[in-house]
Amino acid sequence: MYTFILPTSSEIELREMTGAEEELLTNQKLIRSGDAVNQVLKNCIIRIGENEDVSLTNVLDMLSGDRLFTLVKLRQISLGDEVDLELTCPNTACRAKNRATVNLDDLPVTPYGEEREFVFTLPASGSKVRFVYLDGHKEKRLAQMQEHSISSAMMIRILDIDGNTPSKKALNEMSMRDRSALRQEMLRVDAGIDTTIEFDCDSCGSHIRTKLEAEPSFLFPGVRL
């Protein structure tokens, strides 16, 4: 068993992934519903703090930064620290294959503070927005939405705007200045492990940016999915 300290400062104990978890992570129905990762986390988490009977609800209660941190650590203990990437250049005139190796121990981790709710005053309208961190419940709701949009991703974290329940209409009518400022504030207070990978194409110099967990080789090295 392996023990780590989560970004929320709780201790977590994990076991390695097995073939059962590999099957879950390749089940397209579970992937679309958002249940694949949740079930893998439930299977492989032995303990969170003093809780040795970790349920699916406990997994969904985890903040997103803790969840991604746990997934990265599961990858490390199951498959090793290094991830070999093959990324296609986004430049349509190039499309060269670029290879890179990432050491998961090098990914920066930002701990969570004590606050769980935040109030932000929008610069243009002066409205006050109360919002929270993303957690597993909200991630699952986002995965099940038929339409993925910037408004949906923002709204799912908002508790109220000037005391009123947020709506898609309110988000769509919000000025771009206010929306941009709110997104930046959400990013500023977010914590957890940063899985952003950035480098320049070897052939043309175009910038390549991706999230490590979005790449097949993160969980399936050497396998073409």
Residues covered by each model-derived region:
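Short, surface-exposed, charged amphipathic helix/loop patches that serve as local interaction elements
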Residues: 1-225
